[in-house]
Design a protein with these regions (language model features):
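Fe-S-dependent hydro-lyases/dehydratases of central metabolism
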Residues: 5, 26, 33, 40-44
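Glycine-rich, small-residue loops and helix-cap segments
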Residues: 8-9, 20-21, 28, 38, ...
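Short helix-loop-beta junction
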Residues: 1-9
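Short phosphate-engaging motifs
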Residues: 1, 32, 100
Length: 168
């Protein structure tokens, strides 16, 4: 179709993109846990009954104020930033992001845009992956590099699967 419209399409390879999902989640979850730490129920955010002390207040507030996935992301982000990893994981991810931004920028100096699907599979059925966070995270395969590279993106519907779920 593109060739019939006079549009040249080439395949490009950006090897650093293989690290996009891991890089994205290390950065995103680390920053989310850091930013959400201020929602302690004392100075910011929802305030639950303090119970007997500050520990109980924090626990009650965060239990009521954050959903399951948010809690999972906060805990994972805290682990990444923990003294056990000494911040090395986060610092490495920032370096990979900088390299990714540079490599994607080099491609965009030669081409007008990068064309790829938004998701590797048709849309999930509602509630289908709720208990499989890894599958949900992996569905971001083609969008994480866009966020990390600080470039705009557009998702265009590309049809429907046999069962009617959107592809795009």
């Amino acid at each position: 179709w593109f060739a019939s419209k006079g549009i040249q399409v080439d395949s490009v390879s950006v090897p650093v993109l293989e690290s996009a999902i891991a890089t994205y989640y290390v950065i995103a979850l680390s920053e989310a846990s850091s930013n959400l730490a201020r929602f302690d129920g004392i100075r910011y955010g929802l305030r639950e009954d303090p119970g007997k002390g500050y520990d109980e207040l924090y626990c009650a507030t965060r239990s009521a104020g954050f959903g399951r996935e948010v809690k999972r992301r906060i805990i994972t982000g805290n682990y990444v930033l923990s003294h056990h990893l000494s911040g090395d994981c986060y610092e490495s991810a920032l370096r990979v992001r900088a390299r990714m931004e540079k490599e994607v920028g080099t491609v965009l100096q030669q081409y007008d845009f990068i064309f790829c699907p938004t998701a590797p599979t048709p849309a999930f059925k509602i509630g289908e992956r709720v208990n499989d966070p890894l599958a949900m995270y992996l569905s971001d395969l083609f969008t994480t590099f866009v966020n990390l590279s600080h470039i705009p993106a557009l998702s265009i519907p590309a049809g429907k699967a046999q069962d009617g779920r959107p592809i795009g």
